[in-house]
A protein has these predicted regions:
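N-terminal accessory segment detector
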Residues: 1-99
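Beta-rich nucleic-acid/ligand-interaction surfaces
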Residues: 145-155
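Short, hydrophobic/π-rich interface segment
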Residues: 101-146
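Sequence-level detector for tyrosine residue identity
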Residues: 4, 22, 124-125, 151
Length: 155
């Protein structure tokens, strides 16, 4: 079995450890993050897929995932927050520092993704940016990096 494959095939009700739901979920998140990083690095390192093609796939996935186009910046932010995997809710990774109908600014309090990418976490963030571009493509909002771990969604 390759590192990006999973052997878990049971129904969710059977797979969840009811006595330690938080720990079980945390393990699944780490498993998912690791498998994504392994898949992307394996495909691009072997030349099977170009990274630009993966960004296009991520963008198209984002476009297809939208069920309701956000009309306010807080709605756009919640679309991202509901779609992206940023740890457990208790981790409070995406901390809003400003919110108006036209703008949301937030900071990511920690980098939960970098550890899985063997020094190439920029790959994850480029794929995430492409996904977000797709998610916001039908709206009037754009994502802007403000430097560090601060981001802005605005018109």
């Amino acid at each position: 079995m390759k590192a990006y494959e999973t052997a878990e095939r049971r129904d969710l009700a059977e797979a969840v450890d009811g006595s330690n739901i938080h720990g079980w979920l945390q393990n699944r998140i780490h498993d998912s993050e690791g498998r994504l990083a392994d898949l992307v690095t394996t495909l691009t390192a072997t030349g099977t897929v170009r990274f630009a093609d993966l960004k296009e796939v991520a963008c198209n996935f984002g476009k297809a995932a939208v069920t309701e186009v956000p009309v306010t910046a807080p709605e756009a932010f919640h679309l991202l927050d509901d779609t992206l995997l940023n740890g457990m809710p208790c981790d409070q990774v995406m901390k809003v520092v400003e919110s108006t109908p036209d703008t949301v600014i937030w900071e990511e309090t920690q980098d939960l993704h970098g550890e899985f990418w063997n020094g190439k976490s920029d790959c994850y963030y480029k794929l995430r940016s492409a996904l977000i571009k797709g998610l916001l493509s039908g709206s009037t909002f754009k994502l802007k990096s403000l430097g560090g771990r601060q981001y802005e969604i605005s018109k």
